[in-house]
Amino acid sequence: GFGLELDDLKALRTWGSKTPGHPEYRHTAGVETTTGPLGQGVGNAVGLAMAGRRLRGLLDPGTHASPFDHHVYAIASDGDIEEGVSGEASSIAGTQNLGNLTLIYDANRISIEGNTDIALSEDVAARYAAYGWHVQVVDWTNGGKEYKEDVQALHKALEAARAETDRPSFIELRTIIAWPAPNAQNTGKAHGSALGEEEVAATKEVLGFDPQQTFEIPPGVLEHTRRLSERGAAAGTAWDEQFQKWRDKNPDGFALLQRLNARQLPDGWADKLPTFDADPKGMATRKASSKVINAIAATVPELWGGSADLAESNNTTIEDAPSFAPRERSTDEWSADPQAGRVLHFGIREHAMGSIMNGITLHSGTRVFGGTFLTFSDYMRPAVRLAALMGLPVTYVWTHDSIGLGEDGPTHQPIEHLAALRAIPGLDVVRPADANEVTACWRAIMEHTDRPAGLALTRQNVPVFPRGEEGFADTTDVHRGGYVLLDAPDLEQGGGQPDVILIGTGSEVQLAVEARRILADDG
């Protein structure tokens, strides 16, 4: 399937193969996300399920049967379950009542250091029940008495999970790692390394295979697995018929779907982007960003986003739009809609926010943004790095980008963060100097579809420069990442060489402008 051949399996974990040790998005056909760091896949799955519900709201709202109804399945290891990001994301999934999500927990209780009893002691199923999930346990170990891989029991649990449409489903599948390898099963060595020739041969003998044969597939097994293509073709034909009926009735929806799939913006989307008059008192770039977000949202229905419980500080709310959540989650401050909602509430879960936004972006052509303080980008860095690795157009709104952030002190003052974020290959980090640069930055970000971007924005007011006047450049070259805002007086007349070049970003640009004036006055 997906173009992989037996030779690709033989080349597992070798240089240049289609089968690396950790599957990579866009490297191997059929791989839907890059999930090397543990726990990320759980967050991605939650994002996929959320995006599925949002896409349904955009294209075919309601509760009737729809070609856009689909189910997300994810498999998690003990390591995934131990990682904090999976707990954060699972809590959000329970709050969201994601009935289109099933998580299968391969509970073999073994990690690289051996039995997980040394580090993992809670009742994981009970934890997921507390998150609000539908929980089932399938015990192939039969309480440790006899190991039997009861496929029918697992299938029954999966069917029950699919029937549970009002909450996500969690299946704890109790297994034995490396079964039936006589020496390696149920050991940490089986988790972290290959079995080796002798153990593979011994395992084949237990299974009744010829230990001298390698990569030998019995004809009956091959015939059985190839029936899957027939089932898939039948399911595809049925879906195509359902989709065609929807398309015939919804030409506008189909046009939107085509645009989303192509990641194209609607015609004229930028016509109403705000421009800001020159003002020495100015405004905070986070406030300017809010105005730009809402201008984009008015013409780009696929834009949605929110904050890690800092909406009022990050200025990330799409005004007059409902929150994306079940209606029963509505509060005095927020009115929720499970399909039409465009305002995301991640809670104080920055890592899950980053991972979920990756899943949202992987699912379909919607554009998502998420906000927090710049200093807390540390909490979401692994997900940001994966977005860059996968080339996903996710947008991060990181505010309070300097010491000018109020009374919170050094714990909230980002010092090393810009340098650390700019060190991530494939991540655009932009720090606009004034309100009009914010508009230009957002425009460039929306026009890019092959990489993530982070906006570093101020809490405090910064001057709005007189663009196109008094020697100040307009914002045409902002998309280049750097440009000459204001030349020395002699250079403006077309002659001479600068004695010094002042470089700044964000709120420091006003200091560079003032320094230029002082130096010019001094000759």
Residue ranges: model-predicted function:
Residues 27, 31-227, 427-523:
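Glycine-rich ThDP/TPP pyrophosphate-binding loop and its adjacent helix/strand module
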